[in-house]
Amino acid sequence: MAYKETLKTERLILRPFTIEDFDAAHSWGGNPQNVRYMAWGPNTQEQTREFLTDMVKPGKDFAVVLKATGRVIGSCGIYPDSENDTGNVGWILHMDHWKRGYGTELAGELIRYGFEDLGLRRITSYCAAANYGSYRVMERNGMRREGLRIKAFWARVDKEWVDAAVYAILAEEYNAK
C-alpha cells in the first residue's frame, strides 16, 4: 500500500504529527470530558509525549489541522489490514470543535482515502454506544450499523465497561453513492 503523508478537505489538512503539536494534543487527550467515550485517557503529559512519538507513521495517523488558522484540533487515522483488504477508521476532536461538521468531513476523507487510494474493500469504525456524535459522523458518511459489542472496552473516565456500536461500509456501497 502506498500511503500519503497529507490529506486535504475543504476546511481541514490531515498531516503527520510533530512534537510541536504537544500542547494541542494534550489539550484534548488530557481532558476527562473530551476523552469520556475513549478506551484511553485522560493522558498525563508523559502519555501525550508517548502518543506523539507513536504517531509518526506516514499515511495512517494524522493531526487534524484547520486550514483557516493552522490550529491542530484533533487526531484521526486509518488502520489497514492488508491481508483482508479492510481498514478501521477513528478520530477524536477537541470538544471546542464538536458540532461543526469537522468529524464528518475528516471521516469522509479517511473513507475516500481507504477506498480510492489504498484499495480497501471494507472500512469499519466503532464508538461507545452512548457517543451519539460519532454515530452521526459514521451515518452521514454512508456507514451502516452492524451491531453492538457488549462491554467492549473499559472507559477510564467513567470507570465502567462500555458497549461499542460497530459500523461499516463496503467499497461497492461507497461507489454507489
Model region roles, listed by residue range:
Residues 1-35, 61, 65-177:
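Acyl-donor (CoA/ACP) binding surface of acyl/acetyltransferases
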Residues 33-54:
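Conserved GNAT-fold acetyl-CoA-binding loop/helix
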Residues 54-57, 116:
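Secondary-structure boundary motif
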